Amino acid sequence: MESKRKVEKIMKVVIVGGVAGGASAAARIRRLDETAEILVFERSGFVSYANCGLPYYIGGVIQEQEELTLQTPESFWKRFRIDVRVRHEVTAIDPTAKTVTVHALETGKVSTETYDKLVLSPGAKPIVPGVVQGELERVFTLRTVEDTLRIHDFVQKHKPKTAVLAGGGFIGLEMAENLTELGVQVTIVQRSRQLLAPFDPDMASFVHGQMRSHGVALRMGATVTGLQPDGESVLTLLEEGEPLRADMVLLALGVTPDTKLAKNAGLDLGVGGSIAVNDRMETSAPDIYAVGDAVEVRQFVTGQKTLISLAGPANKQGRIAADNICGGDSRFHGAQASSVLKLFDMTAASTGINEKTAQAEELDYDKIVLFPPAHASYYPGATPLYIKALYEKGTLRLLGAQIVGREGVDKRIDVLATAIRAGMTAAQLKELDLAYAPPYASAKDPVNFIGYLIENLAQGKVRQFHWHDVAALPRDGSVTLLDVRTNAEVSSGRLEGSLHIPVDELRERLGELDPAKPVYVNCQSGLRSYLACRILTQRGFPCAHLSGGYGFYQAVTQEQQRLGSIYPCGIEKA
């Protein structure tokens, strides 16, 4: 046995890039193979860091720079005996010779390393508009720890009073919050008409209202055409309108796969120029694997190839590649882009697909909107969860969900993400046995309510119409618009031309309705309108209720933030 061990060939694994995917692969390989030679090349000065925490170091929430560093070259060697070389850039791959060319950035030395297995984890690079030429002192991108330190040092030294953030995705919004908390007046410039692309425009309206309520200015539908230094400030030039002057500019326009190395090596590329891989994370070249933001993935719900730049999938892919390198057979079954975001005192989260994707894939889907309290409404401090869920009509399978609120958002989105992964239907959602106590939830959890609502629609117990249908409803007397809210609620606004009958008076006042006319019912959140429709339907009235109620309609059409205290639907509080 001893002699056999001596003649066994030691496997040499070279990993290009650390952070999530590369570092995860390296550690997993060591756990599976104590004898393997593992060499990690990282272009930056940090091999494994909390890139999702970078904005919070700039904002002072994370106090110490060291907290961002998950592993160092020294700790990697001490614990895993992994040779990590930072400030080393791999500039070429020869798949035939199984070698990589390495450039030591600090010394300029160029060397060649052989490999038995190669893992590519180059990540993604920030999108910089072509109109931005060269580096400008007060213009930043945020990808690495070095970028973070540069921004942090600038903020500490120059104490900027104004900032323009080009881009309204995750990084842009997190930076907007953190700079605002530092007293910086922030303006977000967004090319599209909404922030947070994974959200549908109606749900994004809550995000818009939240940002504006905290003093963040939004310039929607605006395109950056150039950046121009102007003394101690920078002018952001727009396609339309006057330039925006600010003390600093952050480009957060998204990312694109960093695949130059793979392309030059002749590897097959996929969607958006990403590295094409199979479900074992293998590229088109033998013994070369790829993981992280640079690779294409299968969208779990639709099965289509896409790009998902999130830490969770990158870590999982690193582990899967490591398993297969060490003789296993692990598979990556796709990602559903589950994400969560803190926006001051609000949380926004999503999982699965949105309406834009469902329509592009020509799925036969429907949607529901509900506003349940995050915990029992009688327990102090209850606030609403604004939930939108998409489901497949034929199977009643959950396709996607979006939630905003002050508490309990992350818990519900994780349950729904699990439900999507398990292929759960409405019947299964309503039967989920979830933890309950008044400070945390209601006996019928919001997740259960999603199942109830979908099932009611599928069984024909109620019909619904949506906020975007309201404008097209006839106002010629051929239909009845019925508002069943309380007097106090109606006094603050109502649908034009609507008849007001509180739901508790409806049975006694049915004579005021014409049974020959379709009735379109609204309340504040959708619960009382459902109850009203059940009354009317059983009395022979053709009826539909407004999904999400007047509250959702008003929030979307007026982009008002409505995250105040919530009480059981229809109960007034003095």
What residues fall within each predicted segment?
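Beta1-alpha1 glycine-rich phosphate/pyrophosphate-binding loop at the start
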Residues: 8-87, 127, 176-199, 338, ...
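Glycine-rich dinucleotide-binding loop and its adjacent helix/turn
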Residues: 120-182, 217, 277-279, 501-503, ...
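Rossmann-like dinucleotide-binding cores of NAD(P)H-dependent redox enzymes
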Residues: 69, 162-163, 170-228, 308-314, ...
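A Rossmann-like FAD-binding core segment of flavoenzymes
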Residues: 35-37, 79, 85-106, 113, ...
